[in-house]
């Protein structure tokens, strides 16, 4: 119904962003909302998918069309809901997920919250040879140095984002220890490092 929404990114939360256009604020669930942080109070175009349930109508948003297409492919798999698909895309690019599927790398897929061996195998069976992602798109952010207080705030927000994805307290403690060893300059960077720590 909505291919994309273009407007001002007015708010950013661990699980979603709010885009305002024509006086309406659209709440959009995203894999990693902090990837949009550089667009806060600026115009942004988010590729969207509307999912209608009995109790809600939810908008899901993505940084590019490839990420959106991978999300739509994943939620067609038995046992994969929007939350699980978002968790996968929060820490992997569509290209990386496609490679895991094509190489039948079940172990890679089971590293995400809510994805067991049976579900990982189902993803491979259902999607191998059917995913059309052809190249990896990057969304590199310009890095700026931050002070210690800002870094602590960045780490706190990153941990909240990971908690929202379903990671446990034990896993978050592991991430926090890892992040304290890095000089992180943005929440998006901290989330990426945290996710790499969890899947390594």
Curated annotation (Swiss-Prot):
Gene3D superfamilies: 5' to 3' exonuclease, C-terminal subdomain, Nucleic acid-binding proteins. It comes from the Bacteria. Keywords: Cytoplasm, DNA damage, DNA recombination, DNA repair, DNA-binding. Its main location: cytoplasm. GO terms for molecular function: ATP binding; four-way junction DNA binding; four-way junction helicase activity. InterPro entries: DNA_helicase_Holl-junc_RuvA_I, Hlx-hairpin-Hlx_DNA-bd_motif, NA-bd_OB-fold, RuvA, RuvA_2-like, RuvA_C, RuvA_C_sf. Residues 64-142 are annotated as: Domain II. The keyword Repressor does not apply. One of its GO terms (cellular component) is cytoplasm. Residues 150-200 are annotated as: Domain III. It is found in: Cytoplasm. GO terms for biological process: DNA recombination; DNA repair. Homotetramer. Forms an RuvA(8)-RuvB(12)-Holliday junction (HJ) complex. HJ DNA is sandwiched between 2 RuvA tetramers; dsDNA enters through RuvA and exits via RuvB. An RuvB hexamer assembles on each DNA strand where it exits the tetramer. Each RuvB hexamer is contacted by two RuvA subunits (via domain III) on 2 adjacent RuvB subunits; this complex drives branch migration. In the full resolvosome a probable DNA-RuvA(4)-RuvB(12)-RuvC(2) complex forms which resolves the HJ. Belongs to the RuvA family. The RuvA-RuvB-RuvC complex processes Holliday junction (HJ) DNA during genetic recombination and DNA repair, while the RuvA-RuvB complex plays an important role in the rescue of blocked DNA replication forks via replication fork reversal (RFR). RuvA specifically binds to HJ cruciform DNA, conferring on it an open structure. The RuvB hexamer acts as an ATP-dependent pump, pulling dsDNA into and through the RuvAB complex. HJ branch migration allows RuvC to scan DNA until it finds its consensus sequence, where it cleaves and resolves the cruciform DNA. Has three domains with a flexible linker between the domains II and III and assumes an 'L' shape. Domain III is highly mobile and contacts RuvB. This is Holliday junction branch migration complex subunit RuvA. It comes from Staphylococcus epidermidis (strain ATCC 35984 / DSM 28319 / BCRC 17069 / CCUG 31568 / BM 3577 / RP62A). The lineage of its organism: Bacteria, Bacillati, Bacillota, Bacilli, Bacillales.
């Amino acid at each position: 119904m909505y291919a994309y929404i273009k407007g001002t990114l007015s708010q950013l939360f661990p699980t979603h962003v709010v885009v305002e256009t024509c006086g309406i604020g659209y709440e959009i669930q995203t894999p990693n909302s902090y990837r949009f942080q550089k667009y806060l109070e600026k115009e942004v175009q988010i590729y969207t998918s509307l999912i209608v349930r009995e109790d809600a109508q939810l908008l899901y948003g993505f940084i590019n069309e490839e990420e959106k297409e991978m999300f739509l492919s994943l939620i067609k798999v038995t046992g994969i809901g929007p939350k699980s698909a978002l968790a996968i895309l929060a820490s992997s690019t569509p290209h990386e997920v496609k490679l895991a599927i094509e190489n039948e790398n079940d172990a890679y897929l089971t590293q995400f919250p809510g994805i067991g061996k049976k579900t990982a195998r189902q993803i491979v069976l259902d999607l191998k040879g059917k995913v059309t992602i052809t190249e990896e798109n990057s969304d590199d952010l310009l890095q700026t140095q931050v002070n210690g207080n800002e870094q602590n705030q960045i780490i706190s927000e990153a941990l909240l984002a990971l908690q929202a994805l379903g990671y446990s307290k034990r896993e978050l403690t592991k991430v926090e220890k890892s992040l304290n060893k890095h000089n992180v300059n943005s929440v998006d960077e901290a989330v990426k490092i945290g996710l790499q720590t969890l899947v390594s």
